[in-house]
């Protein structure tokens, strides 16, 4: 039997659980670290660590693909990561950023339709509408209304992530670690420049950062990016992305639970309903993509 059609076995499901736990913990450890390090500078430190770890392993892209690779790095490394950590810093909770970030999946479907001419059926269209409606419902939760700018920043971050994932489809010959390595290498200097401009005193404040701040940046690079994405890459070599994606929706669910149990989140009815709509819509998009053998955007985290 073809492994891609056989579904995920027990060992692969354990890998999925490790990935989801690694990505969910990233929300918690990053939120703690962002209390000590400004978000853009934190993102730059994460990418510095990642660049140092991967620079010896990156492969050059094929001829003519350097501009595309730089565009992907700016979308994913600078704007997605930078804005998502800024959103997490402002939010004061883990639940809403973890859920809203998943809206990049319907956004990527729309961008693939617009840029690449990919078509989707009415069921996928309904799933996209349900996801976006869920963001609106979630936005009226009292916990979210305390910092509406956080919701807006995460939505903009998701737009850049969707754009980056669609552009990545045009890259060829690069493995996941080369993509991550180049994203880190190209992203560091713009983020440092943005931090110097928008976060005055951020560099000087690093002398007061404790192991919580530095450890959060290290975990974000090693635990979330290297471990989480490394295992994810192993899975998608064996199974279609659309087959793996539904299982990875456990990650935002675990992040919400960590937010409630550890971080002190108190989500209201609107967040539970809106969150279910967002994740339900993403699940339907993944299931329709699997049924129609249509490409899915790769799973991402902050």
Where do the language-model regions lie?
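Specific transmembrane alpha-helical segments of multi-pass solute transporters/efflux pumps
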Residues: 21-27, 55-101, 109, 137, ...
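Glycine-/small-residue-enriched transmembrane alpha-helix faces in small-molecule transporters
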Residues: 1-41, 143-170, 189-193, 258, ...
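C-terminal-most transmembrane helix of multi-pass membrane proteins
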Residues: 1-9, 43-47, 140, 213, ...
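Hydrophobic/aromatic residues within transmembrane alpha-helices
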Residues: 33, 42, 87, 114-116, ...
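Specific alpha-helical transmembrane segments that line the substrate/conduction pathway
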Residues: 41-51, 85-119, 157, 241-260
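Hydrophobic alpha-helical transmembrane segments of multi-pass integral membrane proteins
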Residues: 10-15, 41-56, 71, 126-130, ...
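Hydrophobic transmembrane alpha-helices of multi-pass small-molecule transport proteins
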Residues: 48, 54, 76, 111, ...
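Loop-to-transmembrane alpha-helix entry segments
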Residues: 63-68, 95-101, 117-137, 144-151, ...
């Amino acid at each position: 039997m073809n492994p891609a059609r056989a579904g995920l076995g027990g060992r692969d499901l354990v890998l999925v659980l490790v990935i989801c736990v690694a990505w969910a913990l990233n929300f918690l450890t990053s939120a703690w670290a962002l209390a000590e390090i400004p978000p853009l500078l934190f993102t730059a430190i994460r990418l510095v660590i990642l660049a140092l770890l991967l620079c010896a392993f990156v492969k050059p892209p094929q001829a003519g693909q350097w501009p595309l690779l730089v565009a992907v790095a700016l979308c994913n490394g600078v704007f997605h990561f930078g804005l998502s950590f800024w959103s997490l810093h402002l939010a004061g909770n883990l639940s809403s950023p973890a859920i809203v970030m998943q809206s990049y999946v319907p956004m990527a479907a729309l961008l693939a339709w617009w840029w690449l001419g990919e078509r989707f059926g009415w069921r996928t269209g309904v799933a996209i509408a349900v996801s976006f409606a869920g963001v609106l419902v979630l936005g009226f939760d009292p916990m979210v209304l305390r910092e509406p700018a956080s919701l807006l920043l995460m939505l903009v971050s998701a737009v850049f992530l969707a754009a980056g994932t669609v552009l990545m489809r045009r890259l060829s010959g690069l493995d996941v670690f080369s993509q991550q390595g180049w994203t880190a290498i190209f992203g560091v200097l713009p983020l440092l420049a943005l931090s110097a401009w928008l976060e005055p005193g951020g560099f000087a404040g690093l002398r007061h950062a404790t192991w919580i701040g530095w450890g959060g940046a290290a975990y974000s690079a090693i635990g979330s990016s290297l471990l989480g994405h490394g295992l994810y890459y192993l899975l998608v070599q064996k199974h279609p992305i659309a087959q793996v994606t539904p299982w990875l929706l456990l990650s935002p669910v675990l992040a919400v639970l960590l937010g409630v149990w550890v971080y002190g989140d108190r989500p209201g009815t609107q967040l539970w309903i809106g969150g279910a709509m967002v994740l339900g819509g993403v699940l339907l998009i993944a299931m329709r993509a699997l049924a129609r053998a249509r490409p899915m955007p790769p799973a991402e985290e902050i």
